[in-house]
Amino acid sequence: MWSGLLPPGLNESDVELNSDDDTTLESSELNLQEGKEDGTFEKTEMVDIPTDGPSTEAEANINAYEECPSGIPLNMWNKFQELHKKHSEQKTSASRSEKKKRKRSRKGKLKNEEESHSEQSSSETQWKELTQYFGVNERFDPPVKRKKVEKSGLEKRIDQAVEEWNIEKAEELSNQLATRELGVKIAKAIACHNFVKAKKEAENSQVARKKKKLAWGFEAKKRWETKSNMGYM
């Protein structure tokens, strides 16, 4: 406890805090002296914890790397640093170019898929348009009884393979016959489609000509009517 008058600006609590600090300092000094005398004093290292984390470590590594080590000429060290810098720049540029290539390849794949899809849809529409003309002219063919059917050479070969029990050859020849018949059907359908298209175009052109003639005739009739009315006036 403090006895006596206190200086201005202080109170008893401040004096007590100061006395406590003095006692802690004295006790720490005594402990240090005792440790030195006993030989049991241990050194404690203060470890600074980095506040910025890995960025400060990277900066420290860069600074340590930029320092020229002992025993190496300065010009050689500068040349080595320039080469290292160029190598790192090449790595970054290569990584960027790889990313760009990946993006381009993805765009190219999407574009190819869209083109293939559009081509497939257009081919499907054309096929549907042709299939409606399959067998259109078959009604004009003569009946089967009156029609004299002659087998082709391929059909005769199929019959021969069946008689010889050569199933593989018969299947191969039958596939060829089916593709040939399909090709004939497609050719007939294309011819029919072209004929219908040409007929529609001719009809449309004829209708357009008639419309033009009607328009000119109406105007001439109107002029004639106006002239005749003027004659009566």
Curated annotation (Swiss-Prot):
It comes from the Eukaryota. Residues 144-164 form a coiled coil. The keyword Coiled coil applies. Residues 34-46 have a biased composition (Basic and acidic residues). InterPro entries: FAM204A. Residues 98-109 have a biased composition (Basic residues). The keyword Iron-sulfur does not apply. Residues 1-57, 79-127 are annotated as: Disordered. Residues 13-24 have a biased composition (Acidic residues). Keywords: Coiled coil. PANTHER family: PROTEIN FAM204A. This is Protein FAM204A. It comes from Bos taurus (Bovine). The gene is FAM204A.
